[in-house]
């Protein structure tokens, strides 16, 4: 059984990743800021006897990342096989008046959190381990009013 860690795992692509890896018999630890969605995914998959462990928190907050990583490391002495940095969000851009704070928030979720989680888990990977950073074509071509998201995807691409 492998141990997989996923950010943004309660909805969308992240939820599909959680469901897929859990269905393969892997232990999946995921984090998302939507408490209800975390509970729904965790309960649904645990009812099917899958090893899924949901954590509610905002990955833009360094303390949340520290606590999440500490929990995963404590509960997985055998190590981690894969970290999937999936979480990101849109807060608009220039046209919609995306504030400076909102722009920076998107960068913390989409770039800074993956960096810190990679650093926190660095010595806990099994064998060579894997870090998968999800990017987007937006990293190479922006679309109007998506500048915060585009910058985050450019940043995660540069980290990969």
In which residue ranges do the predicted regions lie?
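Canonical Rossmann dinucleotide-binding motif of NAD(H)/NADP(H)-dependent dehydrogenases/reductases
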Residues: 1-29
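Conserved glycine-rich Rossmann-like NAD(P)H-binding loop of the short-chain dehydrogenase/reductase
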Residues: 24-40
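Conserved NAD(P)H cofactor-binding loop of Rossmann-fold oxidoreductase domains
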Residues: 86-91
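Substrate-binding pocket helix/loop in short-chain dehydrogenase/reductase
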Residues: 94-95, 99-104
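Active-site loop-to-helix junction immediately N-terminal to the catalytic Tyr of the SDR YXXXK motif
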Residues: 98, 142-150
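Active-site helix of classical SDR
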Residues: 118, 152
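Residue(s) in the substrate-gating loop at a strand-loop-helix junction
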Residues: 136
């Amino acid at each position: 059984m492998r141990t997989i860690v996923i950010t943004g795992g309660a909805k969308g692509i992240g939820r599909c990743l959680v469901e897929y890896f859990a269905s393969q018999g892997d232990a999946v630890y995921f984090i998302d800021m939507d408490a209800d969605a975390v509970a729904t995914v965790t309960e649904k998959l645990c009812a099917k006897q899958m090893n899924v462990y949901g954590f509610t928190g905002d990955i833009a907050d360094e303390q949340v990342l520290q606590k999440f990583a500490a929990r995963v490391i404590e509960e997985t002495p055998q190590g981690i096989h894969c970290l999937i940095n999936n979480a990101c969000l849109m807060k608009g851009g220039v046209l919609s008046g995306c504030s400076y704070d909102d722009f920076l928030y998107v960068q913390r979720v989409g770039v800074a959190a993956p960096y810190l989680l990679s650093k926190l888990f660095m010595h806990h990977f099994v064998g060579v381990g894997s870090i998968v950073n999800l990017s987007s074509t937006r990293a190479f071509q922006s679309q109007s009013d998506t500048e915060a998201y585009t910058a985050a995807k450019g940043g995660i691409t540069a980290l990969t």
